């Protein structure tokens, strides 16, 4: 079902809570804003947050002869979304599955979803390097994974886990497109000045260590958090923000890497 997808990008993080799903959703919206047809696949089975972030909770998944039909965010069908969150009756319901059942579900997401022609498929993964990640890489062997974006925060404890993620990518032959440092500094909602709360430049030093591109540094911006629960892009709502600037840079970087 991935034959019609031109470019597949996996978004990874070594630790949970670094804003990986927010980066995935806003990157998808930014790509759509730039005229691309985009798919967003949420394979974080135990913590699916994409339906909430895009305001799609309660939407139903339908079955057709070719497989599951993803949820579209707009009538023009320029952004398609698939998540186990659409299959749960309540958002609070836990997914209590052992590894084999998780593996089977991820394989079904990657082989039985009817994606139409897409320029990009963004795969939002759970944190770490678990069965889910190995299953994704195995399923993508035939069509190929075109690269990974790694999201981290500047704290040393998060950077340690990202180093493991980098090693995982190298061992599974995934091309690292770059590292995004998230939650670096706090943007005051009143004066928009940025204050470093945690350590800073961890993403830059890590990118230098791994010899991969540093795609940008995102601050904690309360204005971005307000956009959760909608399909509004930062590029539309906050065009002058640092977040919009970094996302635009990432999109331009992807344009230079991939022939769309």
Swiss-Prot record:
Localization: Cytoplasm
Keyword Iron-sulfur found: yes
Residue positions binding ATP: 14-21
Pfam families hit by this protein: ParA
Cofactor remark: Binds 4 [4Fe-4S] clusters per heterotetramer. Contains two stable clusters in the N-termini of Nubp1 and two labile, bridging clusters between subunits of the Nubp1-Nubp2 heterotetramer.
Keyword Nucleotide-binding appears in the UniProt entry: yes
Cofactor(s) needed: [4Fe-4S] cluster
PANTHER family, per the entry: CYTOSOLIC FE-S CLUSTER ASSEMBLY FACTOR NUBP2, NUCLEOTIDE-BINDING PROTEIN NBP35 YEAST -RELATED
Family membership: Belongs to the Mrp/NBP35 ATP-binding proteins family. NUBP2/CFD1 subfamily.
Role, per record: Component of the cytosolic iron-sulfur (Fe/S) protein assembly (CIA) machinery. Required for maturation of extramitochondrial Fe-S proteins. The Nubp1-Nubp2 heterotetramer forms a Fe-S scaffold complex, mediating the de novo assembly of an Fe-S cluster and its transfer to target apoproteins.
Protein name (Swiss-Prot/TrEMBL): Cytosolic Fe-S cluster assembly factor Nubp2 homolog 2
């Amino acid at each position: 079902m991935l034959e019609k997808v031109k470019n597949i990008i996996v978004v990874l993080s070594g630790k949970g809570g670094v804003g990986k799903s927010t980066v995935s959703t806003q990157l998808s919206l930014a790509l759509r804003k730039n005229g691309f047809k985009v798919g967003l696949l949420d394979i974080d089975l135990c913590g699916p947050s994409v339906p909430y972030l895009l305001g799609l909770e309660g939407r139903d998944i339908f079955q057709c002869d070719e497989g599951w039909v993803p949820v579209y965010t707009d009538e023009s069908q320029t952004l398609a979304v698939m998540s186990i969150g659409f299959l749960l009756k309540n958002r609070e319901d836990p997914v209590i599955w052992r590894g084999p059942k998780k593996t089977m579900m991820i394989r079904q997401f990657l082989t039985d979803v009817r994606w139409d022609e897409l320029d990009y498929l963004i795969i939002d993964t759970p944190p770490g390097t678990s069965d889910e990640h190995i299953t994704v890489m195995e399923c993508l062997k035939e069509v190929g994974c075109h690269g990974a974006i790694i999201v981290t925060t500047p704290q040393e404890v998060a950077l340690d886990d990202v180093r493991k993620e980098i090693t995982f990518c190298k061992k599974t032959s995934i091309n690292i497109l770059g590292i995004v440092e998230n939650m670096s500094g706090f943007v005051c909602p009143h004066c928009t000045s940025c204050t470093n709360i945690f350590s800073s430049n961890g993403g830059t030093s890590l990118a230098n260590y791994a010899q991969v591109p540093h795609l940008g540094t995102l601050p904690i911006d309360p204005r971005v958090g307000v956009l959760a629960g909608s399909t509004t892009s930062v590029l539309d709502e906050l065009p002058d923000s640092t977040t919009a600037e970094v996302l635009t840079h990432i999109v331009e970087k992807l344009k230079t890497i991939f022939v769309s």
